[in-house]
Regions:
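Conserved alpha-helical scaffold flanking the Walker A/P-loop in AAA+ ATPase domains
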Residues: 9-15, 55-74, 81-82, 86-94
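Conserved catalytic segments around the Walker B and adjacent sensor/switch elements
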Residues: 44-54
């Protein structure tokens, strides 16, 4: 596994002390290697790994199965940010006192999306950021690396980045022209639903937009920062309409530009 030196050292200590937690929560961005890290844990404890669904029915099925297994088994709940409260509550008792051969791993983007009672019963591992040297070991395209923060980012198609860059430049042009119509026309290219795979990823757009905005100081004011920060934070929440959040931010930035001229 690339990077994650401190987390790997933690695993080694667990193994040496024979103290691998029975319930682990792995927190990190999509593409940061959470599932890969979970597989490293499973291999370390020599367990069978099973990826489970997050519905209440599948959680109950997991619990029933956990009490009948006869060999070490690790149940993985991926992207549990969106797991319903009923399902999380159903897990509480079994993760507090796991059956003899059962281990449980949850992966989440934001640990704050977990119930406090769930967090208190688990051991949290936070995925570490990757250095440019680590990312360069799997990708040698400087344009891709410019916008890569994790391993998954290095696997993006160059065409996707170029399309996103064009969208960003269209938005910048709209801000310069002080035209809300041009800005909103450009944002029609952004993905508003997960199923719209042919459209531009909102988080990638935001990353490239903030980078490009630095070259246009006339388009932001000290007051603009709060809108950028707010939108960046909102994009980390799984329940938010990311496209709408970006559009709201851009309208606010446009208002700031217009007010500067008055």
């Amino acid at each position: 596994m690339i990077g994650q030196k401190n987390n790997i050292n933690t695993l080694i200590k667990w193994r040496c002390n024979k103290s691998v937690p029975r319930f682990i929560i792995i927190s990190g961005d999509i593409g940061s290697g959470r599932l890969t890290f979970a597989k490293v844990i499973i291999k370390m404890i020599n367990a069978k790994g099973i990826i489970m669904g997050n519905s209440i029915a599948e959680v109950r099925e997991t619990i029933e199965n956990a009490y009948t297994i006869t060999e070490p088994t690790c149940y993985i709940f991926r992207n549990a940010d969106d797991m319903r409260t009923e399902a999380k509550n159903a897990l509480l008792k079994v993760v507090e006192e796991p059956p003899n051969n059962a281990y449980f791993i949850m992966t989440v983007e934001n640990i704050d999306n977990m119930l406090g009672t769930i967090k208190s019963r688990g051991t949290v591992i936070s995925m570490e950021p990757y250095s440019q040297k680590e990312l360069r070991s799997v990708c040698d395209d400087d344009f891709i690396l410019q916008y890569a923060t994790n391993i998954a980012d290095t696997k993006r198609e160059r065409a996707e980045l170029e399309r996103t860059e064009h969208c960003v430049l269209d938005v910048i042009a709209g801000l310069k022209a002080k035209s809300g119509t041009k800005i909103l026309k450009a944002t029609t290219q952004l993905r508003s639903k997960v199923t719209e795979t042919d459209k531009i990823d909102c988080i990638l757009f935001m990353l490239m937009f903030k980078s490009e905005l630095l070259y246009h100081p006339e388009l932001y004011t000290p007051n603009s920062l709060k809108y950028l920060v707010k939108c960046t934070q909102e994009l980390q929440r799984s329940s938010i309409n990311k496209k709408a959040s970006i559009e709201c931010m851009l309208v606010s930035l446009l208002d700031e530009v217009k007010n500067e001229d008055n």
